[in-house]
Regions:
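Small-residue-enriched hydrophobic alpha-helices in membranes
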Residues: 1-149
Length: 149
């Protein structure tokens, strides 16, 4: 099994940036999101172990405080692209040392986190009679899926 010990400090930092970067892509997709979406990202970390079976790698990821890349981009679109790049880099690092099964578990974890963030608030006027996930959030999740490929 692959664990934190198998990666350099820089590689591990990149792996830790992947999940919150995916969550931020979803938050940015719909005019900045909400506090509820931000909290849903934190909740996803605590629920991850129950949903993804045994994985020392995910145990190590979940055990650490989520890392956020503090880079500042000019526009929301640039920030979104920067965070999608973080997701791509994280999966690329994992592919070099983790098993295929562990890479797939990480993908499912990141995608599950993004989906929880998207479902955190109901769309529509005052949250009434709206959808749980907006079209913009669905598009963001599709982009995250592509980045994880």
């Amino acid at each position: 099994m692959t664990s934190k010990a198998d990666f350099t400090e820089e590689e591990w930092k990149t792996i830790l940036e992947g999940p919150p970067s995916a969550g931020l892509v979803v938050i940015l997709s719909d005019r900045g999101g909400s506090v509820r979406e931000t909290f849903s990202m934190a909740r996803a970390y605590t629920e991850a172990r129950r949903q993804h079976g045994e994985s020392e790698l995910l145990d190590d990821v979940v055990a650490e405080k989520p890392e956020m890349d503090r880079a500042r981009a000019g526009s929301p679109e640039e920030l979104k692209q920067h965070n999608l790049d973080n997701v791509r880099q994280a999966i690329a690092v994992l592919k070099t040392k983790a098993t295929e099964e562990e890479v797939d578990e990480y993908r499912r974890f990141v995608l599950g986190l993004a989906e929880r963030v998207a479902e955190a608030r109901k769309e529509g006027f005052l949250g009434l009679s709206g959808e749980r996930v907006s079209d913009a959030e669905r598009a963001a999740i599709t982009e995250i899926e592509q980045a994880l490929a």
